[in-house]
Amino acid sequence: MDRREEEEEETGYGEKGTRNQSKEDESRLGKIFELIPLDMIPDILLRLPAKSAVRFRIVSKLWLSITTRPYFIRSFAFPSSTRLCLMACVKARDMRLFISLHQHDDGSYAHVDRCEIKSPKHDYYNPSSESVNGLVCFGDFYNIVVWNPSMRQHVTLPEPKPHSTVRYFIRSCLGYDPVEDKYKVLSISGYHNGNHDPLVFTLGPQESWRVIQNSPLDIPLPTGGSRVGTCINGHVYYEAQIRFKVDDIFNFENILMSFDVRYEKFNTIKKPADPTLRNFMLNYQGKLAWFCSDYSSIRFWVLDDGDKQEWSLKNFILPFPISPEIDPIFECRVMLTGVTHDTGEFIFINATMCDAFCVLYYDPKSGSERRIEYEGIGDREFCINTGILECKRFTIDWFPNHNESLMSLVNVLKKAD
């Protein structure tokens, strides 16, 4: 197998158009790109979509070397805000369909990018965390799958092996250490006796699950279909439950946990004293936010200082109702799914699949809103093609501020030679 065939197998981009390209066309293409100054090549490649950047690896050994360097891959994962998208993941039958909806389209109607990937044998429905630099993680109980939709790749991690076999759930979160440029999966097993068993897996060759020593007694709440955690600035945040004893009686308290991905240390964070029942975490422009919403307003607390545990309150009255009320413009139910990193706009999507799928971006500071209708999502043809109409169970998960990644998952489970 030559280098190009290896590249096609690794990236999943070995499609007919590339494989059948004649040597004459490749030679002509190479001569054109030889005219480009060397110092401009990385900047040009960083502006391309992931699919194009991967295919341009056939131009020359130099271009292959540039696009596979760790520095280039890392830079590609932090694009300008205009390239961020709202990604939908449809799980139905034995496949996952990843749909990218660009967050900064100017028009009222926009096209979408699609990528369909066959699921591995054990592919569970629940997402474990938000998109982390283009990677997403799904898992439940004993199977954890990390996906890179841009490279059309996924890897199923080995089953975590805790100390005890008597456990009743496992929760996992994907995190990123920006200092050492490492991705880690945190997995915590819960037991009926209230103990815990935290493990961590670094994405890379010759790695395995490691026990995290000296961690506190905490148990992540079984959150069902909602995400367990979110990664912000090298820390994974997730909701947890701690147990303590008062007068020989065990009590429980719901708190937030912070996990330092680099140093693998835990820290407890006291949640704001807010009586609202509908609570959830979001990344609010690079800070952890604890959202407390009702059907006409959004109130959220922003963690300004994690060490001092200082929260600031923000409160906004919405000009439209939130699910379960029917919005008169959407003519269906809408729900909050995220906040744009750059502009701080709230992202509202259809809570149910409508014939015309729309996303509403609302700027709470200016009170302005923009509505984008995305073609080919939610209509009958879409439901037939994805198999939704035939499935008794399917899910659609949303990942705001998703970006493309060139990180390869092929060698994650590779053993030493």
UniProtKB/Swiss-Prot annotation:
The UniProt entry, under PANTHER family, shows: BNAA05G37150D PROTEIN-RELATED (PTHR31111), F-BOX ASSOCIATED UBIQUITINATION EFFECTOR FAMILY PROTEIN (PTHR31111:SF43)
* Entries under SMART domains matching the protein: FBOX
Domain F-box: residue ranges? 30-76
Which residue ranges does the record annotate as region Disordered?
1-25
Instruction: Please note every region of biased composition (Basic and acidic residues).
Output: 16-25
- List, alphabetically, the InterPro entries matched: F-box-assoc_dom_typ3, F-box-assoc_interact_dom, F-box-like_dom_sf, F-box_dom
Task: Tell me what organism the protein belongs to.
Answer: Arabidopsis thaliana
Q: What is this protein called?
A: Putative F-box protein At4g21240
Q: Locations of Acidic residues compositional bias?
A: 1-12
